[in-house]
Amino acid sequence: MNLTIYLITDDKYFKDRDLFNTIEQALQGGVTAVQYRFENKTTRQMYEELVKLRELTRKYNADLVVNDRVDLALAVEADGVHIGKDDLPPEVVRKIVGDKMYIGYTANSLEEVKRAQELPVDYIGFGSIYHTSTKENYKLVGVEALKEAVKISQKPIVCIGGIMPYRVPEVVRAGCRNIAVSSGILGFADVKKAAESIKRAYQETLRMLMLMGKV
């Protein structure tokens, strides 16, 4: 499981873009995992795209995660599946996938992070850290809550929501080591360059923290 720079797809960024070329550019820029999240496609369309993305992510030694759809995740042998509170319960998903893949779970409050410690999930997506244009209905939690989430969770925290290249140092200093990004990469014309900016900011901040003895 390598979710250091975790790209999450979104319908609105692929209206005039080729999915595979765009994802490959992001992978070349340093993305370590890709979550396939689309709503306006048929199951067959999603399956066919995921088959190609599975090949592409393997080429770059990156993880492939499928949002919501456990059936599709199993069908293409994805590395992980991500679920939320309105999806199948984590216990049921674990019974279905066994140890074939890891499970991610969404938490939108510190209380939900605490409850998730008892669930059979492998990482927790926590946010929204900042205001975001990717989702219409979201809960803003902020950086201080992120710091606390990292402290109280025994499971890896993936921070999500409005994370642009210039905000990466702040979330890394807050203790987060896994960064989920959508608009921060896909919102730019040069996707590879945007991914490189995220990666550079991450590595430079981590290096500085190590020099200061804060890691």
UniProtKB/Swiss-Prot annotation:
GO terms for biological process: thiamine biosynthetic process; thiamine diphosphate biosynthetic process. One of its GO terms (molecular function) is magnesium ion binding. Keywords: Magnesium, Metal-binding, Thiamine biosynthesis, Transferase. The keyword Metal-binding applies. Mg(2+) binds at residues 68, 87. It is an enzyme of class 2 (transferase). Its cofactor is Mg(2+). 4-amino-2-methyl-5-(diphosphooxymethyl)pyrimidine binds at residues 35-39, 67, 106, 135. GO terms for cellular component: cytoplasm. Pfam families: TMP-TENI. SUPFAM superfamilies: Thiamin phosphate synthase (SSF51391). Pathway: Cofactor biosynthesis; thiamine diphosphate biosynthesis; thiamine phosphate from 4-amino-2-methyl-5-diphosphomethylpyrimidine and 4-methyl-5-(2-phosphoethyl)-thiazole: step 1/1. 2-[(2R,5Z)-2-carboxy-4-methylthiazol-5(2H)-ylidene]ethyl phosphate binds at residues 132-134, 162. It catalyses: 2-[(2R,5Z)-2-carboxy-4-methylthiazol-5(2H)-ylidene]ethyl phosphate + 4-amino-2-methyl-5-(diphosphooxymethyl)pyrimidine + 2 H(+) = thiamine phosphate + CO2 + diphosphate; 2-(2-carboxy-4-methylthiazol-5-yl)ethyl phosphate + 4-amino-2-methyl-5-(diphosphooxymethyl)pyrimidine + 2 H(+) = thiamine phosphate + CO2 + diphosphate; 4-methyl-5-(2-phosphooxyethyl)-thiazole + 4-amino-2-methyl-5-(diphosphooxymethyl)pyrimidine + H(+) = thiamine phosphate + diphosphate. Binds 1 Mg(2+) ion per subunit. Transmembrane segments: none annotated. Its EC number is 2.5.1.3. It comes from the Bacteria. Belongs to the thiamine-phosphate synthase family. Condenses 4-methyl-5-(beta-hydroxyethyl)thiazole monophosphate (THZ-P) and 2-methyl-4-amino-5-hydroxymethyl pyrimidine pyrophosphate (HMP-PP) to form thiamine monophosphate (TMP). This is Thiamine-phosphate synthase 1. The lineage of its organism: Bacteria, Pseudomonadati, Aquificota, Aquificia, Aquificales.
